[in-house]
Amino acid sequence: MSRIELYDTTLRDGSQGEGISFSLEDKLQLTRRLDELGFDYVEGGYPLSNPKDAEYFQRVADLPLKNARVAAFGMTRRRDCAPENDVGMRALLASKAKTITIVGKTWDLHVREVLQVDEAENLAMIGDSIGWLHSQGRELLYDAEHFFDGYHANPDFALKTIQAAERAGARMIVLCDTNGGRLPSEIVAGVEAARRAVSVPLGIHCHNDCDLAVANSLAAVGAGARQVQGTINGLGERCGNADLVSVAANLALKIPGSEILADRGVTRLTELSRFVYELANMNFRASQPFVGGSAFAHKGGMHVHAVNRLARSYEHIDPETVGNERRILVSELSGRSNIVAKTTKFEIQHDRALMERILDAVMREEALGYQFEAAEASFDLLVLKVAGQHQPRFQRVHYRVNVETDQDSLPLTEATVKLRVGERVEHVVAEGDGPVNALDQALRKALLSAYPSLSQMQLVDYRVRVINSSEGYADSSAFLRAWSRALT
């Protein structure tokens, strides 16, 4: 199998997802990162849509990219307008992008009801736009919007549109499942029909409205597509686009002979995924295949026992292949194998009786509502206590939190903490923005002189668990545990 091109449209299609916006610097940073990993194309945006995208193309031209070609995205000319007079066409040329991706209508429904032109004019719009841009020395890719819906409704016309693009000079025809509603079998049928109709290479662009974007993309490759368009982490409008992280991992690791990315690019997929989540100011998706924090996390005792003996018994690939790592979780569902795996870093005797006592302690705590899966430090403290090796750094005498209103009727939270630190007793009061912040400030005041490194530690997140949902209140000890867990 020849090289499969990866065309990333995170900066254009991905930014159309709800709540997602990339700054100009974000766009340039991601372009550099994608180039480092060996992506073939980076679609930077639509130059006519906003000043930020227009400036991006001016700035990106100065980047010393080694692998990726930067593409500008645009639409066909307007009806009854020559391409050289069309503002969109002129903006694409002004972007100075060497590659231009033009999207055009393939579904006769859109031609009649959205563009409100006849079929002949739509074919002319496609041919004129691609032909004029091609004559200006640009590489042209044609996105056949709604191709699979169009092929289902009117196969002859759908195929005529991509033939018009080929005749005008498109290097590649990209077949789009724009509504994300087609099944893999329909994708295969459409790709095979397109291969019979045109001789230029085909690409695939799938949306995820049926949770099939990755599967449909891989099915298209199997049917002969040589480019996959998508976004990192599947970002995009509605339900998103094909996740290029999963696409790349599957192509590299599951389909023999596929050539993708640069040397060691696949091993950086986890890094790339999390980098994009950070740029988009989004939380990582724990269950994301290949790169999620839970992708290689094992909780059931039988599973952990088997993984400790032979990792591939419960893992389809080595986590390090994609830059991820194996995690052993501890919970009330755990067996002794989980406990043994999680306590190897401690200098304790790993006898059966101690492992059982630790497991019993975990079960008792979780029965009260605590969780240790994302609380590594809390579990470590529990192990040391059960093993008789815990040396407390301080002792809590008592604490109190008051929530009142000030003279302007604004909430005012005050925490009082009394601790025994060595031979001294620290009794302090602090105000904060809510109970957790007030307790954080009070504890810092009490402990900072003994433990100066606390000044380098920040409380970045916390959780409050409602222990008895029918009563609708949070248990105070669970509340405090959530705070101390986040701090450690």
Which role does the model predict for each range below?
Residues 4-6, 16-42, 49, 57-65, ...:
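Alpha/beta enzyme core
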Residues 20, 46-50, 78, 119, ...:
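Hydrophobic alpha-helical scaffolding
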Residues 66-73:
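A glycine-rich helix N-cap at a beta->alpha junction
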Residues 258, 283, 446-456:
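Active-site phosphate-binding and catalytic loops of NTP-dependent enzymes
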Residues 433-452:
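A short, contiguous, amphipathic alpha-helix enriched in charged residues
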